[in-house]
Design a protein with these regions (language model features):
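Structural beta-alpha unit
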Residues: 1-3, 16, 23, 45, ...
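Small/aliphatic-rich secondary-structure junction motif
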Residues: 1-58, 156-217, 313
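Gly/Ser-rich helix-loop-strand patches that form or flank binding pockets
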Residues: 3-5, 21, 30, 99-153, ...
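Hydrophobic alpha-helical membrane-association signature
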Residues: 20, 71-74, 174, 178, ...
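General small-molecule cofactor/ligand-binding pocket signal
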Residues: 36-38, 90-94, 144, 194-196, ...
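A short acidic, glycine-rich active-site loop
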Residues: 57-73, 217-230
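Active-site phosphate/pyrophosphate- and oxyanion-stabilizing loops and adjacent acidic/basic residues
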Residues: 133, 180-183, 236, 293
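Charged, low-complexity C-terminal accessory regions
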Residues: 138, 198, 220-275, 280-281, ...
């Protein structure tokens, strides 16, 4: 199944660029998709030349062109490898605020997914820094952030879902987007596909220790059981559309979603988490949501963040 027609790979020099390129190339090949490779020089056109002139006293324009030529040459090497692999590829060196220019590229060209290696750390792994988090929060299409040096293929993929009540169609669509994407990735990598839903009884601790309710533990136990049963029913209803997920691979996790999903991913050596993010649908601007933020800042595996329908990026093509 072709899930993507246009893949954008961000190959910043300070990121896990090789990992991102290999994954983007593999994804483009599997989908017969076009591949665009970009790097961003963190200065607006003309600013780099002025800065270099101030530093060197002369020849700032020529030196700036050398800098841009270096970045173009670096992308051209990646591009040549993609062409040798039979992939339709183009390259672009952008100038400006990095996350803004990448998102503007998505808006202009209609890319289906952005792939980026996280900022490289001395130990060879990736860490999520400002550029990475801005793209994850504000890019309108799914963003795949790779954090490990060996992220070329995956053995275990986790779809983190939040099954909706029957009357919440928007949340149901987001969950299905997450599962469709995770299932496609698992099929291509021949990876195990797991699905997790975190649940809890709101204010359970306060109820168990409250002045008026601490003596009613059996009643609180029944409330917890009912909440668990509701969560189980919603998860089963969602997974009825995904027979490829074995019952043993669906997991109800009790606790704060951000914490228990991150803990589960570490304990089970999950390679990739696919998750939805919570936004203010229809508003220009985006709130990632506590669950997604906690997961992103806690996990040591790669993540694909999927936006809800109706999401509007605060970045505009002109001046945003």
């Amino acid at each position: 199944m072709q899930q993507f027609r246009s893949v954008l790979a961000v190959l910043s020099e300070d990121s896990l660029a090789e990992v991102a390129f290999e994954r983007a190339l593999h994804l483009a090949q599997a989908n017969e998709a076009a591949l665009t490779l970009v790097d961003v020089v963190d200065s607006n056109p003309g600013e780099l030349a002025r800065m270099l002139t101030a530093l060197t006293g002369s020849r700032g324009t020529e030196i700036a062109e050398d800098v841009l030529a270096y970045h173009r040459g670096r992308l051209a090497e990646f591009g040549a490898r993609a062409r040798d692999a039979g992939v339709e590829v183009s390259e672009a060196v952008l100038q400006g605020v990095p996350f803004v220019e990448v998102i503007r590229m998505v808006l202009r060209e209609g890319h289906d997914i952005v792939i980026k290696g996280a900022t490289a750390a001395p130990d060879g792994r990736g860490v999520l820094k400002g550029f990475d988090m801005h793209i994850l929060r504000k890019c309108p299409c799914p963003v795949w952030m790779l954090v490990g040096p060996g992220d070329g293929s995956f053995d275990r993929i986790l779809a983190a879902v939040d099954p909706a009540p029957a009357d919440d169609a928007a949340r149901d669509r987001l969950n299905r987007m997450v599962l469709d994407l995770a299932a496609g990735m698992a099929e291509r990598d021949r990876a195990e596909l797991h699905v997790a839903h975190a649940w809890y009884l709101p204010e359970e601790h306060a109820l168990r220790h409250g002045r008026y309710t601490s003596g009613r533990q059996e009643e609180i136990d029944r409330m917890v059981d009912r909440e668990r049963d509701r969560a189980q029913d919603r998860l089963l209803r969602l997974l009825a559309h995904y027979p490829q997920v074995p019952k043993a691979n669906s997991h109800l996790l009790k606790g704060n979603p951000g914490d228990v999903i991150a803990d589960y991913a570490r304990a089970r050596h999950v390679d990739l988490i696919v998750m939805g993010t919570v936004g203010r649908t229809g508003l220009a601007g985006f709130i990632m949501g506590n669950t997604a933020e906690t997961i992103l800042r806690s996990v040591t595996c790669s993540v694909i963040a999927v936006k809800p329908e109706g999401f509007e990026t605060p970045v505009t093509l002109n001046g945003g």
